[in-house]
């Protein structure tokens, strides 16, 4: 157990610096905005939705069915909410456990010597694991790896006990159960069944390729083939259920996710897809350059035969074929330890375990599955079990390296990425085995101790360098800004775009704008980046430029509902109501089929309908507004916050004098969000209208309590008090409102009115002056300022404002009448003669 404990401890220690990290990249959608984690969402939704919370049968679903991983996120949320520390802790503990199990697997292959420990330490420290462990969504790969190893180890136990019916079949049942669990953590987990079959055929029974056919028809081998047949049948059942559950339809991805898959040129697709495994293997060999995302142009397409990367591809497949052939062809007589034979599965050579491949010479002529067969069953002496030969370990290592990678290879179906580092978590087990078995073979062949020591220390140095790289790379995953900055050299378009979002959230507006423009420099047709830049410009009142980028975003992706939404809002605010209406209508007609995030799309469509209803409402078309609001309610997704929509429904019914319906929707608004201030105010007005004055006052006071710094709340309460004849209280509320919202003309102007009604003319004058300053060319503001100055005896100032008001509105009868009265007073006081 020492090797397992040391390896697990290293796996734990190397990732301790991730515990203080934040949610990063895909964590946001899989955890922070995933409705399946919330307590109010039924538990069984996890088994019908994909990893991102989208219904699995939806055309826009990624078809990533990982319910056990999502369940673990939900448990994290249940006990710790959205505190990332808890999520990271689970990931680190899982990686430590996987490392221990992998080391235990190595013990079955290498014995209890140092090579087992080396393999375990290599796996614990390999930097390719940082995305899987440091990124919380990588838990899918780590968890799948845990159950993958449990399944494989159980099947190995089944092989060693075959013939003892009860224990043997218990082990194979456990292997099948853990395989299913592995697949339910992540899809590639099902490949453990194929790896188990490879172990049984080529490692446990040491069959060569030319021996497999000859043993199929021998009755004495029935138990062996029954085991392999069970693996095959269980795999078919799991895959069949998986395809059925996702609606028997493949996922769809955008061009940027996997450019080669979308390329129409067969040569380009073929060369690129053949090259990608080479690139993945290089990341395992030399994980110097890592990135959070390898999509878009991170790996340029190979378009011609003359591309120098094709040399890497050819070399890779030649070496792979030679390695597989040399391991499978095999002479039955191979020796690793100078012909020395193991006792109890071990032999010590200079303190390091190694083994012999000594087999009977007639093995090639008479292929036999078992060392001793009785009725087709292999019996074993558990005290004299030999360790697998080097060739056997290489075969198993290759199967661990290749088979779990096949689902990500684009061989059977296209995937939504070019390279994904976390996908290499399980294949890296095979890589670590290959490195270890290669180092061991060199160590055994080395004749001089100095060479042995050199090789040993070189291997130790590799582990140290891997560990240091892992710790440093973990630092990049500390927060999103560091992560995206680290990815600029690999995928500049994606990294700059995501960095822009982070900088914007930090209120670094100029830096964010620069980041968005850098992203568009590298890839000008990214709809999300065009939209994000437009949104940034809109929020900074650069409306014309914002409209330009929204138009480009919609041109790049015609289904971008959020682009239509914000375009419509700008047009509506600019008074271009007909253009806004057409924009909102077009948005509402966009279907959610084949969209990456259908829930976000539905939210944008619902918001478009809400704003279209508001547009009709402001134009007095209340019945049309209600029709649109009802459509919005039908289309809104679960995560949409409906309180504003319900409140506007109530407002429309109030304008149509359907008081009972209005009250229903006001209360629905408050049910959906009990602290929704507009609903408190509108419901308070309804209660006032229906004579429930005490109840109305409670709602107005509650609104003030919810937000004591919101002037509009004091103004509504002031109007209520004014209607109740409590004039001084009303004036005090109005004054408070104007002080809080001193830049809002309506609030300031109404406050001045209430203060004048309360005969607080000096205070009223102050706020009339403020209102006139806010709208300097508004005749009513100037006329009312003149009137209060008139009342306060400031006659010359009053005259000046009356005359300004008449310049703007010459035919205003009230202003003309007030001015004549003012002149009469001024004549009596000698301030003005009748000839002037």
Curated annotation (Swiss-Prot):
Q: Where in the cell is it found?
A: Membrane; Endoplasmic reticulum
Enumerate the transmembrane spans: 1-21, 78-98, 108-128, 133-153, 165-185, 189-209, 221-241, 313-333, 393-413, 415-435, 450-470
Q: In which pathway does it act?
A: Protein modification; protein glycosylation
Tell me which parts of the chain lie in the Extracellular compartment.
22-77, 129-132, 186-188, 242-312, 414, 471-836
Q: Which GO terms describe its cellular component?
A: endoplasmic reticulum membrane
Kindly indicate whether the keyword Transmembrane belongs to this entry.
Answer: yes
Task: Give the EC number(s) listed in the UniProt record.
Answer: 2.4.1.109
Q: Indicate where this protein is primarily found.
A: membrane
Give residue spans on the Cytoplasmic membrane side.
Answer: 99-107, 154-164, 210-220, 334-392, 436-449
Which GO BP terms, alphabetically? protein O-linked mannosylation
Enumerate the catalysed reactions.
a di-trans,poly-cis-dolichyl beta-D-mannosyl phosphate + L-seryl-[protein] = 3-O-(alpha-D-mannosyl)-L-seryl-[protein] + a di-trans,poly-cis-dolichyl phosphate + H(+); a di-trans,poly-cis-dolichyl beta-D-mannosyl phosphate + L-threonyl-[protein] = 3-O-(alpha-D-mannosyl)-L-threonyl-[protein] + a di-trans,poly-cis-dolichyl phosphate + H(+)
The residue intervals holding the TPR repeats read: 493-526, 527-560, 561-594, 606-639, 643-676, 677-710, 711-744, 745-778, 779-812
State the annotated membrane topology for this chain: Multi-pass membrane protein
Instruction: Specify whether Disulfide bond is a keyword of the entry.
Output: no
SMART domains with a match to the protein in the record: TPR
Q: Name one GO molecular function term.
A: mannosyltransferase activity
Alphabetized, the UniProt keywords read: Endoplasmic reticulum, Membrane, Repeat, TPR repeat, Transferase, Transmembrane, Transmembrane helix
Q: What does this protein do?
A: Transfers mannosyl residues to the hydroxyl group of serine or threonine residues.
What family is it from?
Answer: Belongs to the TMTC family.
- Please state what the protein is called: Protein O-mannosyl-transferase tmtc2
The coding gene here is tmtc2
